[in-house]
Amino acid sequence: MFYLIYKEKGISSFKAIKDFAWQNNIKKIGHSGTLDPEATGLLLLASDEDTKLLDYVDKKFKSYRATMILGLQSQSFDSQGKIINSSNLKVDNLTIEKTIKNFVGPFVQIPPIFSAKKINGKRAYEYARQGSEISMKAQEVFVKSIEIEKIDFPKVIFKAKVSRGTYIRSLINQIGLELKTYALMDDLERIELSGLSKNDLGVVSDLDIIDLEVLSLEKHEILTLAKGQKFSKDLADGKYAFIYKNTKKILGICKIESKIIAPIKIFNKKIEKSLKKDEKNE
C-alpha cells in the first residue's frame, strides 16, 4: 500500500518513517524522497510489494512553502548553518517580486555543500563537516511556478513548484545574490508531491500516483506474465503498469516492444489476491 504522511519539524525523515512502520506493524517500507530534519511536510511511503513501484511514481514536480530571510548568508544556505555574510541593503517589495518571478523556468543551480548529494560514494555534508574542500557540480533544474504570499522585509514567504533535484535553499541563496544582497532559508514545508496534498493524508491509491499508462489485462494474460513469459499485444512501445480487468490495484509493470509484451516487475501476492477475489465474485 501507499501512504501519505506529514513529517513534523525536528525529527529526521527516517525516524518519522520508522515510527509510522512500527505503529502500523509494517515490516517492509520505502519512501519516494526525504526531508531535512528542520523541514516539515509530506512524505510518500510504500509498504510490502508496492515498494517496487516507487521507481515509477510521478516525481516530476514538488511544491514547497518557504520562508526567506534577506541580508544573511550561511554555509548551509539556511538558518541552521554558520553565518558567513551579511548586508544591510534594503530592497523594495517590487524589486523582490520581480526578481523572484524571474526564476520561473529553467536555470542552472549549484547544490548546497551541506546536502545529501552523493560525491564519490559519500554525502556532501560528510565532506563539509570534515572541512574538506569539494566542488559541487552545477545542474539544470526547473521552476514551474512561484507565488509570493507575504513580504515583510527582511522576511519573504513564497510557494514554489519545482522539478526533482531542485534545492530550495540554493534557489533562495541565488535570489539573494540576484538582489545584490544575501538570503537564507528560515523555514520549509513540502505541500505537494506526486499530485497529492495534505487533503490526501492516509492511504493513497497507486493509480493516482503512477507515472505510467495503465493497461487492463485478462486473467490468462496476467498469468502468462507472472510466469515470466511474453505474448503479442498490439500497443505502442513503452512501459506500462497493468491491472486485472477494472480492479484498482496495480499488479505489475511490463514493457512492449514491437508489439510483444514482456514482464518487468510482477507482484505475485497481489495477483493471487485479485484473482481469488474475482473467482469468489463469479
Swiss-Prot record:
GO terms for biological process: mRNA pseudouridine synthesis; tRNA pseudouridine synthesis. The active site is at D36. Its EC number is 5.4.99.25. InterPro entries: PsdUridine_synth_cat_dom_sf, PsdUridine_synth_N, tRNA_psdUridine_synth_TruB. One of its GO terms (molecular function) is tRNA pseudouridine(55) synthase activity. Responsible for synthesis of pseudouridine from uracil-55 in the psi GC loop of transfer RNAs. Keywords: Isomerase, tRNA processing. The gene is truB. The keyword tRNA processing applies. Pfam families: TruB_N. It comes from the Bacteria. This is tRNA pseudouridine synthase B. It catalyses: uridine(55) in tRNA = pseudouridine(55) in tRNA. The keyword Lyase does not apply.
